[in-house]
Amino acid sequence: MNIFKNLCIGIGVLCLASCASRTPVAQEMELTQYVHPNIGTVHSRWFFYTPAAVPFGMAKLGASTNGTYGNEQGWEAVGYDETHTSIDGFPCMHEFQIGGILLMPTVGTVKNIPGKLETPDEGYRSRFDKKDEYATPGYYSVLLKDYQVKVELTATERVGFQRYTFPKSDSSHVIMDIGNKLGESGNVRDAYIKQVDESTIEGYVVTEPEYVKKYQAGATVPMYFYAKLSQSPNSVNVLFRGKDLMEKTEIKGAGAMMVLNYDTSKDQVIDLKIGLSYTSIENAKLNLEKEAENLSFDEAKALAKEKWNDALNRIVVSGGTEESRIKFYTGLYHALLGRGLASDVNGAYPKNDGSIGQIKLKQDGTPEYNHYNTDAIWGGYWNLTNLWAIAYPEYYNDWVQSQVIMYKDGKLPKLAY
């Protein structure tokens, strides 16, 4: 009852915030310059470091230094650590208890395990130098030293973009490690990956996070993807982690992986667009088509920067030192990053019982609101709900609607996965 009372109070705050007039800013400031995503990344949580994302997005991309280790209890520090010197891949999804769709470009002999930080040569991970790494809201890049491959990441709300610039090699690869434990996602219960045609890969992974085991035994979290390649691979292999390569284009089961093989020229660029969804492969495809079918990497990068500047300019501070502005806007950036979309462009969303719900559509065919399912009312403990209501009322409206629809579906969450 107290939770429901707090929710009603929140709705009242929303009404006040929505009715409040906002004085338009004549010209937006370039506030992304004050956001330093690498601050606080030593011993940080899985969902903390996702520079290649837009505010409140589903697609949250970043580098992982030990995400493939998994997470024994569901809350330990894992993912990206500023003190680490090698990278084990670039996941597309980072949320509380959710991690999936890891990609890694390599050159040379294919290795079928990620390897450890202490012994990077045993796996497909690569060393990197901090001087070759760059992170800003909406974009990330790094040079993988062991392969001399430059990796760039950006995103729209539901689509991840990965760009690889390869050296000249007749043994360039893109490893898609789909069916293995990643970050806080827990053990994999099922996975599937298939080459649909020369330029399309699709699949899913179903995980059982540790917190789900504790609080809703038997439930699982599925993640679906639909990826388009800018260039077709010369050949494709599949395998289960640690096993020999097989000359097939489809594989199912925990541990499933796919390797795309290329013969690359010097500075050859290969782009991937990865549509994401919590409901189905079909909706992952639809999300890609609606948000990014005709969008280039550079266009997506520019749009992401614009979205971040728009969001950060909701609160403009003056005076103080540059260090203080960096602290403020980096904190605001994290307040807008960690609560992600769960619904698709057509209004489909994952219900607590494992079925698929449908948000009512407006006359133009778009959903009446977006569904968000991360952290739920925990945000109230950190005063995030007040921040959203005052500065981001359109998001707060969707957030409240998300809590209400979960209540109507049978739960009013303290946490939602």
What are these regions (language model features)?
Residues 1-9:
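Bacterial N-terminal signal peptides that target proteins for export
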Residues 17-18:
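C-terminal motif of bacterial Sec signal peptides marking the signal peptidase cleavage site
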Residues 24-417:
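Accessory carbohydrate-recognition regions in carbohydrate-active enzymes
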